UniProtKB/Swiss-Prot annotation:
Top-level taxonomy: Eukaryota, Viridiplantae, Streptophyta, Embryophyta, Tracheophyta
Listed SMART domains: ANK, cNMP
Entry protein name: Potassium channel KOR1
Gene3D superfamilies: 1.10.287.70, Ankyrin repeat-containing domain, Helix hairpin bin, Jelly Rolls
Protein origin, superkingdom: Eukaryota
InterPro entries: Ankyrin_rpt (IPR002110), Ankyrin_rpt-contain_sf (IPR036770), cNMP-bd_dom (IPR000595), cNMP-bd_dom_sf (IPR018490), Ion_trans_dom (IPR005821), K_chnl_volt-dep_EAG/ELK/ERG (IPR003938), KAT/AKT (IPR045319), KHA_dom (IPR021789)
Main subcellular localisation: membrane
Ranges that cross the membrane: 103-123, 131-151, 175-195, 202-222, 237-257, 317-337
UniProt subcellular location: Membrane
């Protein structure tokens, strides 16, 4: 594993600018009891971008390779040791020498904060010894100003350490540089040089901005869980009270010095008489006694004891005391409120400290590693400082209102995600109300390569990097994830291991969606699910890497289509009109078929749901679609006996489309299924369809003696002259059956058919008793020498056919033009109906005769 976080740091806010920490030695031993347990500092997680490279994901190096990329490198400033003082002339805030300097400046800040009101009230021109001390302090602050132009800081938005000198300088100039610089001016010398103008002395108060360093010190002590929180808070409150009274005492004395010596009696201290001691000519009294008297006046006034021994004399003093007492009421409320919070342990900081202690006990007990310790503490500190868990206050608000809040906060982000391009507003709304907001620090791994993923993430702010393992076993950066990006969707949608690691580069605000919730939404919004998979396959964000997953994506698209088709067919099968409409409204295509080629119309017709059939016809489902078994919706309705549905389909132009219709009808006749035969014939079935033996359904009915079936077939137009491959007609089958009624029915049908179609009698006769004739290739009057051997041929239906057949059998050459057939008397035969069975014919060319006829020659 690559280099992790270098050291632990104490949290400091530094005016919202940077948060320099304090590196402490980490305790590695587990404490035996709670009382003696080691308390750790709250740590600031370092800028860990580029850390944890190498072996963290080596176990998955053989899986899901995504190609080779050049890794992205980052420069990280040194953290510890003397070598880290300057890095490109930038000081790391965690350098131990710089931390010592900040403590040195803290001492001067305490001195300056207390001495500035004292100088303003009691001195008009510093004595020599205090003057040199003041100059030394200002020099120290000037050095600190110079150093702060080179101190790196942590960006509050990205949480990355900024080492750019220009950015550091601009940031400092925009913050406290002006006040720090003005505070270093020698205002005492300027006051004397300006002729002791009183207005100049007011500029001394600029130095009170240095009190912010003291405030930051107390704030860091409150967060340092090694120090008792109650003690820290009490010390802070005492210091606040003393500083307020100290400043008020200096102002009280200053008000008295603004009047000339001749009017000292009109001041609170000049008119003061304590016992036998008079404060007339108070400027000549010892400095300590004057300060203590002023401090006593300030404290008694703040406590509103009102002994009356010291009181205001002139109007200015009265006005200041009124302002001071009003301020004291606010200060008193602040002090009492803080003490109450200490007693009931209700402050946010104390809750954070308690939570941190519990976490540290857990980490010590389970002996967690250094890297995971840093991440846990960093997250706790982030929760405390950013207050991003404040959304928990909404838990008591109704779900509907929380949903509206989520839409207001997160909907713009989700709508801009490329993964959801083209999705419906209803789908986006369902996604938004199920989002959870999370923050991650730089360097943290959110998803690891090869792991099972059950969360989908969307980037609101910050930056992340996708890292894969190359063929050489080293980490390689695959892609950068910026705002409006998403990750985890490949593993979630394709149900495969995470193809690459996702690591935080900058402080990130992410929106998290649970896989189960996402799957549930996709089951309802089918079209949006297909759109998401399509967007994923077309995404350029992953470049060529997505090509390796195209088969998975295609498989899941097909799987989703098949599942959706089954759900539509299932709704049609059970006649669930509401569910069917909901599915189609959500984007399901009713024209799709299942694994057997069946559409919803097949199943609805099979079950006899007329309303479903009407709805599907309105949706444009193919009315004549055949499944893998050759069944159409109309045939399904006919088979199941749903006359109303069959009538509806037939009226819309549906066809029965019976494959091997003869076999179907013959089988139905054989089993006596009169209803099926009647419906099949009523909706377009052919009563004369033949099976593999050329038998018509009427053959089967006659052979089996099924009178009603035969009558049904005859009424539907079945021909009694149909012959099978053995030349048998239904009438022959009826005679063999021995059923008198059957024979009578078929004889009557024969008579009726002959009356309508007379030619059929001849056709049957020809088929039943075929005629033949003898054909000779010479003239009937030729002598014995010219006679030739003839052939016997069947008489076809046309004279041309007879000539052609005889020519072929006799082996005569030529096209057959000019050939004539003559009878025994030499007369030309023009029609096959003139030829009787067994007649002799002669095939000649031209008219023929003794004087001019010519016989056909081979």
């Amino acid at each position: 594993m690559g280099r992790g976080i270098g050291s632990k740091r104490r949290v400091e806010d530094d005016d919202g600018e940077n948060m320099p920490g304090r590196k402490k030695k980490e305790e590695e031993e587990e404490e035996e009891d709670d009382d003696g347990e080691e308390e750790y500092e709250v740590d600031v997680v370092r800028d860990r971008i580029g850390s944890s490279r190498g072996s963290r994901l080596a176990l998955f190096g053989s899986d899901l390779r995504l190609g080779r990329f050049r890794p992205r490198r980052r420069r990280v400033a040194p953290v510890d040791g003397d070598d880290g003082i300057f890095q490109d002339f930038v000081i790391d805030p965690d350098n131990k020498w710089y931390r010592l300097w900040t403590r040195f400046i803290l001492v001067w800040a305490v001195y300056s904060s207390f001495f500035t009101p004292l100088e303003f009230g009691f001195f008009r021109g510093l004595p020599r010894n205090l003057f040199f001390l003041d100059i030394a302090g200002q020099i120290a602050f000037l050095i600190d100003i110079v150093l702060r132009f080179f101190v790196a800081y942590r960006d509050p938005d990205t949480y990355r350490m900024v080492h750019n000198p220009t950015s550091i300088a601009l940031r400092y100039c925009k913050s406290s540089f002006i006040f720090d610089l003005l505070g270093c001016f020698p205002w005492d010398a300027i006051y004397k040089a300006c002729g002791s103008k009183e207005e100049v002395r007011y500029l001394l108060w600029i130095r009170l901005t240095r009190a912010m360093k003291v405030t930051e010190f107390f704030r860091s002590m409150e967060k340092d869980i090694r120090i008792n929180y109650l003690f820290t808070r009490i010390v802070k409150l005492i210091v606040v009270e003393l500083y307020c009274t100290h400043t008020a005492a200096c102002i009280f004395y200053y008000l008295a010095t603004t009047l000339p010596e001749s009017m000292e009696g009109y001041t609170w201290i000049g008119s003061l008489q304590l016992g036998d001691y008079s404060y007339s000519h108070f400027r000549e009294i010892d400095l300590t006694k004057r300060y203590m008297t002023s401090l006593y006046f300030a404290i008694v006034t703040m406590a509103t004891v009102g002994y009356g021994d010291i009181h205001a004399v002139n109007v200015r003093e009265m006005i200041f005391i009124m302002i001071y007492v009003s301020f004291d009421m606010i200060l008193g409320a602040y002090l009492i409120g803080n003490m109450t919070a200490l007693i009931v342990k209700g402050s946010r900081t104390e809750r954070f400290r308690d939570k941190m202690k519990e976490v540290i006990r857990y980490m010590n007990r389970n002996k967690l590693g250094k890297d995971i310790r840093e991440q846990i503490k960093g997250h706790l500190r982030l929760q405390y400082e950013s207050s991003y868990t404040e959304a928990s206050v909404l838990q008591d608000i109704p779900v509907s209102i929380r949903a509206k809040i989520s839409q207001t906060l997160y909907k713009p982000y989700i709508e801009s995600i490329p993964l959801f391009k083209g999705c419906s507003a209803e789908f986006i709304q369902q996604i938004v109300i199920r989002l959870q907001e999370e923050f991650f620090l730089p360097g943290e791994v959110i998803l690891e390569q090869g792991s099972a993923v059950d969360q989908l993430y969307f980037v609101c702010h910050g930056a992340l990097e996708g890292v894969g393992i190359g063929e050489d076993g080293q980490e390689e950066t695959i892609l950068m994830l910026e705002p409006e990006s998403s990750f985890g969707e490949i593993a979630v949608l394709c149900n495969i291991p995470q193809p690459f690691t996702v690591r935080v580069c900058e402080l990130c605000r992410l929106l998290r969606l649970d896989k189960q919730s996402f799957t549930n939404i996709l089951e309802i919004f089918f079209v949006d699910g297909r759109r998401i998979l399509s967007n994923l396959s077309e995404s350029s964000e992953y470049g060529s890497r997505i090509k390796q997953l195209e088969s998975d994506i295609t498989f899941h698209i097909g799987k989703q289509e098949a599942e959706l088709t089954l759900r539509v067919n299932n709704a049609a099968f059970y006649g669930d009109m509401h569910q069917l409409k909901s599915l189609i409204r959500a984007g399901a295509d009713p024209k799709n078929t299942d694994y057997d080629g069946r559409s919803p119309l097949h199943l609805a017709a099979c079950k006899g749901f007329e309303d479903v059939v009407q709805f599907l016809l309105h949706e444009g489902v193919d009315i004549d679609l055949s499944d893998k078994f050759g069944n159409t919706p109309l045939l399904e309705a006919v088979k199941q006996g749903h006359d109303r549905v069959a009538t509806l389909l037939f009226s819309k132009g549906a066809k029965l489309s019976l494959e091997n219709a003869g076999s179907h009808l013959c089988t139905a006749v054989a089993r006596g299924d009169t209803d099926f035969v009647r419906r099949a014939l009523a909706y377009g079935g052919d009563p004369n369809a033949r099976d593999y033996d050329h038998r018509a359904p009427l053959h089967i009915a006659a052979a089996e003696g099924l009178y009603l079936m035969a009558k049904l077939l005859v009424d539907a137009g079945a021909s009694v002259f149909a012959t099978d491959r053995w030349g048998t007609t239904p009438l022959d089958e009826g005679r063999r059956c021995g059923s008198r009624t059957m024979v009578q029915l078929l004889e009557a049908a024969k008579s009726g058919e002959l009356s309508r179609y007379p030619e059929r009698g001849e056709e049957v006769r020809d088929k039943m008793h075929p005629r033949r004739c003898s054909v000779f290739p010479h003239h009937p009057w030729d002598g014995g020498e010219r006679r030739r051997e003839g052939v016997v041929v069947w008489i076809p239906h046309t004279i041309e056919g007879l000539v052609s057949s005889a020519q072929e059998k006799l082996g005569l050459a030529g096209s057959g033009e000019g050939l004539r057939l003559l009878g025994e008397d030499g007369a030309r035969v023009l029609d096959v109906d003139m030829v009787h069975d067994g007649q002799k014919l002669y095939l000649v060319v031209g008219g023929g005769g003794d004087d001019g006829g010519t016989e056909a020659r081979q």
